[in-house]
Amino acid sequence: MTRLPYYEIHSFADPDVPFSGNPAGVCVMDAFPDDTVLAGIANSNNLSETAFVVARGKDQWNLRWFTPAVEVDLCGHATFAAGAVLLETGAVRGDTAHFQTRSGPLSVSRSAAGFTMDLPQVGLQAGKPDTATRNALGLSGHELDAVFDIERIHGARYQMWVLADEDTVRDVRPDLGQLRTIGKNVIITAPGDAVDFVSRFFAPASGVDEDPVTGSAHCSLAPYWADRLGEARLTARQIGPRPGRLEVEPAAGRVTFHGHAPRYLDGAIILPDA
């Protein structure tokens, strides 16, 4: 049997809200096995994302991400979780874990209040609100500020829908079957009541009905709201059934994330010998 160190981290947890943040699995390996093994582990974990990390040099790691259904090109909260694990367990000797990924070099560092992470911004283009998506989101008759198309980063179409207020975002009850049929992942967002902005993220096209706190979504949200509000550093909350809180700073084509990453469990995944 093979034992693989395994951790579950609640990325971007709100310190004031128990059981908040986005759960991510982190599996530390000597080498990547066959992709079917990685996919099987992620499917068995049944978390929105599982991160797999393999050492490649001093404080340097290869990193891959899998949902229960597919491998993805970028996952912010699982990157945040992987960095937290490596820094807290002493696997990283310095203060920063450096990753090589499908989306290029990424990093997670210690900070006074938790951890910071650096990800690339993901661009927006003006889009149009189509009837099928509007109906799937249950937004017929609701005011829309804007709709944007987002670069494909999970192998699926992405859109960001900007709504009027926080209550509208909180009250959305999407028809996930319709969104899955459309083949579209959707971020909904609005100005926040007690923070700069709020959001939710539905990703049935990538095998995740609703992701609790989504780093990659904030790669588009952060520059949009920074430009709209004229702020350099913003506080954000994702307000689905399992909320989370983070701070974001977009600059020079990147987004710096600040947040907490408490460890929920650690142990081992036990695989039978081939």
Where are these regions (language model features)?
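Active-site proximal loop and beta-alpha junction motif in alpha/beta enzyme cores
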Residues: 1-74, 80-274
